[in-house]
Curated annotation (Swiss-Prot):
Gene3D superfamilies: CD59. It holds the Pfam family Toxin_cobra-type. InterPro entries: Snake_3FTx, Snake_toxin-like_sf, Snake_toxin_con_site, Toxin_cobra-type. Disulfide bonds join C24-C45, C38-C62, C66-C78, C79-C84. Belongs to the three-finger toxin family. Short-chain subfamily. Orphan group IX sub-subfamily. Residues 1-21 form the signal peptide. Keywords: Disulfide bond, Secreted, Signal, Toxin. It comes from the Eukaryota. Expressed by the venom gland. One of its GO terms (cellular component) is extracellular region. One of its GO terms (molecular function) is toxin activity. This is Short neurotoxin homolog NTL1. Its main location: secreted. It comes from Bungarus multicinctus (Many-banded krait).
Amino acid sequence: MKTLLLSLVVLTIACLDLGYTKTCFNDDLTNPKTTELCRHSMYFCFKNSWIAGGVERIERGCSLTCPDIKYNGKYIYCCTRDNCNA
């Protein structure tokens, strides 16, 4: 009976997927950098950087897809590891 109960507990934990949530750096030029927990469907961390008024602007966060559009000098970087968008 204990074996059956233990098996059910292990199966429940495995089915709930209690483990992994991706973390990405967020916001812009904060020091120290802050992170956010991404929602379950967010697979990518991104970093957008561009020059506006002679000042570099940076935006970071979680994303469902990896945008690959580069326009007007804007650089977009995507990655899939935790905190890889430094």
